[in-house]
Amino acid sequence: MASEEFPAAKTALEEYENIERQMGEQEVWSNPDKMRKLGRRQAQLGTIVNAYRTWLNIRNDLDAAQEMAGEDPDFAQEAKRLESELPEAEEKLRTALIPRDPDDARDVIMEIKAGAGGEEAALFAGDLLRMYMRYAEKRGWGVTIQSENSTELGGVKDVQMAIRAKGNPSPEEGVWASLKYEGGVHRVQRIPVTESQGRIQTSAAGVIVFPEADEDDDEIEIDPKDLKIDIFMSSGPGGQSVNTTYSAVRMTHIPTGIVVSMQDEKSQIQNRAAALRVLKSRLLAMKHEQEAAEAADMRHSQVRSLDRSERIRTYNFPENRIVDHRTNYKAYNLDAVLDGDLQAVIDSDIQADEEQRLASQQQQQ
C-alpha cells in the first residue's frame, strides 16, 4: 500500500539506535557526563521512536494481511482492524514529530522575588515557594535551595532553587517542560495578617525560571577573564551572620552584567561551583532567546523570555479562586493548588502551547 515514509522519524530511529550502541561501550558508560548527555538525547528521541515503531508495525502487518486477505477471511478481517488503527498511529507520529523546545528534558533554576506590598508580598512569595516545593514532591523531583533571603515574620524577600528530576526523563516529563510556564508576575488578593481593618490587599511576587545547564555543558563556554568574583560573609534573616567564614560568593559576568550570588553551600569552593552553574544556565537561556528571535519565531521567544512585567496568574483568597490570565483557566480550589496540586493549571498552559505549535506546523506545510 502507498504510505508516507516519515524520513525524519527514520533518521530519529537511526540516531536512537546509535546512542544505544554508544551507551554499551565501556569508555562511554564509565563516563557519567557522556552518559548523562546521551541519556538526555535518547529520552528526547524516545517519544518519536516509540510512535514510529508503533506506526511501522501496524503498517507492515497491514501490508502482510492485505496480501493474504484474498486467500483467508481471517486475514481480511485482520486487515480491516489494522486499517482502522493506522490513522490514529499516524496522527500520533505526526504529533511526536512537531518540534519541541529542545530544553524540555532539562532541570530548572527558579527564582521567586517579593514585589510591591511589603511584608505581605514576602509572605506570598513564601507561599509560592512552598507551593512549588510541594508540587515538586508530588512529581518525584528534588529541590535544592541555593540562596534565600527571608523576613522575620517568615516571609521570603527572594529565593533561588534548583528543581531536578531523577534520571533522564522524556521531554514531556522534564522539569522545564512543566515549569517554564511559571515565569512572570503572580498576583495575590487577600486580607493580610498585618491588616487590622479586614481590608483586602493586592500584592505580587515575580517568578523567573530558566533551564539548568550541565556542569560540563559545551554549549556555553565562559572565559575566566570575563568573571569578577567577590567573596563575602554569609548572612541570614535580617542580615544576621550565618558563619564566621567568608564563604559566600558573588560572581559577575562582565560582558553581560549578569550577577549571581551564592551562600547556602558549606564552603567557598561549593558556592563558587554552584554560582558558575547558575551563571551558565542564565547564559544558556539568553543564547536560546537570541536564537529564537533570529529565527523570527515570536511565539517561542515570548515563552522563553519570561517577561517579568506580565501578570500571568491571580490568587484570590476570599473566593478560594485561581485564574491563569493566559489561558483563562479558572478554578475554586486555591487551597489545594497552594498545597502543590498545580498540575491542572500547568496542563492548561501546556495544551495552549501545543495548539500553537501544531498551528505553526500546519502553516509551514
Swiss-Prot record:
Subcellular location: Cytoplasm
Main subcellular localisation: cytoplasm
Listed GO CC annotations: cytoplasm
Post-translational modification: Methylated by PrmC. Methylation increases the termination efficiency of RF1.
Keyword Zinc appears in the UniProt entry: no
Pfam families xrefs: PCRF (PF03462), RF-1 (PF00472)
Keywords, ordered alphabetically: Cytoplasm, Methylation, Protein biosynthesis
N5-methylglutamine, modified sites: 240
GO MF term list: translation release factor activity, codon specific
Top-level division of the source organism's lineage: Bacteria
InterPro entries: PCRF, Pep_chain_release_fac_I, Pep_chain_release_fac_I_sf, Prokaryotic/Mito_RF, RF-1
HAMAP family hit by this protein: Rel_fac_1
Family note: Belongs to the prokaryotic/mitochondrial release factor family.
Function: Peptide chain release factor 1 directs the termination of translation in response to the peptide chain termination codons UAG and UAA.
PANTHER family for this protein: LD18447P
NCBIfam families, sorted: prfA, PRK00591.1
Protein name from the UniProt record: Peptide chain release factor 1
Organism: Bifidobacterium animalis subsp. lactis (strain AD011)
